[in-house]
Curated annotation (Swiss-Prot):
SUPFAM superfamilies per UniProt: PUA domain-like
Domain (ASCH) ranges: 6-98
Identification of the protein by name: N(4)-acetylcytidine amidohydrolase
GO CC entries: cytosol
GO MF terms, alphabetically ordered: hydrolase activity, acting on carbon-nitrogen (but not peptide) bonds, in linear amidines; N4-acetylcytidine amidohydrolase activity
EC annotation from Swiss-Prot or TrEMBL: 3.5.1.135
Function of the protein: Catalyzes the hydrolysis of N(4)-acetylcytidine (ac4C).
Alphabetical list of Pfam families matching this protein: ASCH
UniProt keyword rRNA processing present: no
Organism: Yersinia enterocolitica serotype O:8 / biotype 1B (strain NCTC 13174 / 8081)
Residues annotated as the enzyme's active site: K20 (proton acceptor), T23 (nucleophile), E73 (proton donor)
Length: 102
């Protein structure tokens, strides 16, 4: 059985349309492996909405995020940093999980 990853409801449409192709997580969600298929569910209610294939998992700091990361998240760099700070207040070390729908 595939492991699961959750996303806030506000990201569902972008994931389904392949506009969001990465997720940035803290160390507690950094153990996914390239080639692994994950069930994707909404964080708020646990409803399944697709599967994704993990392409890569790369460590990164908040300050090292670029416009390319923001583009892969389908938002501006300022928006991306704000979202990350809201979800993970006080953290600086993260992991970029690149994925594709499958």
């Amino acid at each position: 059985m595939n492991r699961e990853i959750t996303f806030f409801r506000r990201f569902e449409a972008d994931i389904l349309a392949s506009r969001k192709t990465i997720t940035i997580r803290d160390s507690s969600e950094s153990d996914f492996r390239p080639g692994e298929i994950l069930r994707v569910c909404r964080n708020e209610d646990g409803v399944f909405f697709c599967n994704i294939l993990v392409k890569s998992v790369t460590p990164i700091t908040l300050d090292a995020l670029t416009e390319r990361h923001a583009e892969q998240e389908n938002m501006s760099l300022d928006e991306l940093k704000k979202v990350i700070k809201d979800i993970y207040p006080g953290l600086e070390q993260f992991y970029v999980i690149e994925f594709t729908r499958c």
